[in-house]
Amino acid sequence: MNNLNVLNIAGYKFEPLDELDVLIPKFQNKCDALDLRGSVYLSPNGINFSLAGSEEAIEQYLIFMEEDPRFLDIPLKKTYSETQPFRRMKVRLKKEIISLGRDDINPRELTGEYISPQELYAMYENNEDVIVLDTRNEYETRVGLFENAVDLQLDTFRDFPQAIEELPEEYKEKQIVMYCTGGIRCEKASAVMLKAGFSNVKQLEGGVLDYFKETGGKYWNGDCFVFDERVALDTNLKETEYIYCFICREPLSAEEKASPDFKINEYCPYCIKK
């Protein structure tokens, strides 16, 4: 019996928006009426949302959203879960729909070339000379990452511009394929690299989640961190054994939960000494 009754969707679009003071309560009221949970971030440069609810409610949300032509043609990431992975519904005004802290970066004007999941898969199969670059945070890469990927060990995405300055100079002439969970960070990260003089920068279209869906996840080691109470998904897009530490919110594997440095609701290996 399939108990995966909750539909999870995520999407984003870089699009100039005005009248945000009207849009925010409009989105909040609609999501509340549909009993959806998750987040919708609106900014002068676009929308970024992650929502969960019944299939009917999600369908009604999409009809509502697409009544505004600015929100048409948004590619969606869809997964299913047994339970609601979000605690509340929030619609927020943001300066940026993904925070980088660089006013000069606009993906509508400059961003890296997209490559499909199948193209990245073929690069691995053919052992191509390519630098696979992870743009996610350290607590995400610890859960899983692509085979031979360069991990920048970021604390936050805002650290990305500084981190690439420390990459080997020869990378500027190499073919680079970057990736993140769903694609939004790479829209900006690829522009940062192009402006910094990296000549051949591509981004994985749809991110890791689309790679799992389209290829089955070969060449991925581990699971993929997601920003909700499921914590991580495996290559079949199913929930895993990862949990959050109740105190510090670090993702914890089964092995870390078995550590003597873990006590439920009190401490974990990452916060016991803090």
What is each model feature region?
Residues 2-113, 137-175, 184-274:
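Rhodanese-like catalytic fold shared by cysteine-dependent sulfurtransferases
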Residues 110-126:
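Internal catalytic-core helix/loop-beta-alpha segment
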Residues 132-134:
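Structural scaffold elements adjacent to functional motifs in cytosolic proteins
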Residues 181:
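Aromatic-flanked redox-active Cys/Sec active sites in thiol-based oxidoreductases
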